[in-house]
Amino acid sequence: MILMGFSLLCWRKLITRIRPAEQHDVQAIASIYVDTWRSTYAGILPDKVLIEMSTERQMVMWARAIRHAGGHAEEKILIIEEEKAGIIGVSSCGFNRDRNSSYSGEVYTLYIHPNHQNNGYGEKMLAGLFEIMIDQGYNGAIIWVLSLNPSRFFYEVMKGQRIGEREEKLWGTVVREIAYGWSDLEGALESGRPQLS
């Protein structure tokens, strides 16, 4: 009986909802963004950059991004809410900013709060983005990830193919980025990874 109650509690904890981001979400989104960057990029990006990140500045940036996405059919911002914890992740997608790429869609961001990672929320968010891009007629999608970002292996688990590398300069630090691509978004959804349920 105790085990049954424990299982029910665990199942209830995973009840989630994915929806478009709205202006009243900006504080939660900004907090997730700052906390995730500080957790993920410690030792990768300069400490000064991470220390000086502020929720207030990110709120302004995300408010602008949500306004833009609301009036721009090609760009979407999604949040994921957990029943009790509230908003625990944010993601965005749209057209591939590299117009010469054979992948027409791009995942711009996918952040799950550090306290809620490794619980399947990233899979649900990625699936939600793929569904949007399928609806918009994109033939595939890419995401660029810092090579030293430990979360990049998530995209390999999600069947993303390593399709490119580049070097960028961020805050005076040269970093290497890796591109992961999915050439068949419908196939990626049907394969069971990523999946919504």
Give short role names for the model-derived ranges:
Residues 20-24, 34-44, 49-115, 126-128, ...:
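Acetyl-CoA-dependent GNAT
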Residues 29, 33:
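Hydrophobic "lid"/C-terminal helical patch
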Residues 100, 109-127, 134-136, 146-153, ...:
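Conserved glycine-rich acetyl-CoA-binding loop
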Residues 2-27, 186-197:
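Conserved N-terminal entry element of GNAT/NAT acetyltransferase domains
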Residues 49, 53, 75, 102, ...:
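Residues at secondary-structure transition points
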Residues 142-146, 156, 161-179:
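Conserved catalytic-core motifs of GNAT/GCN5-like acyltransferases
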Residues 28, 106, 140, 150:
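Amphipathic alpha-helical recognition patches that constitute DNA-binding helices
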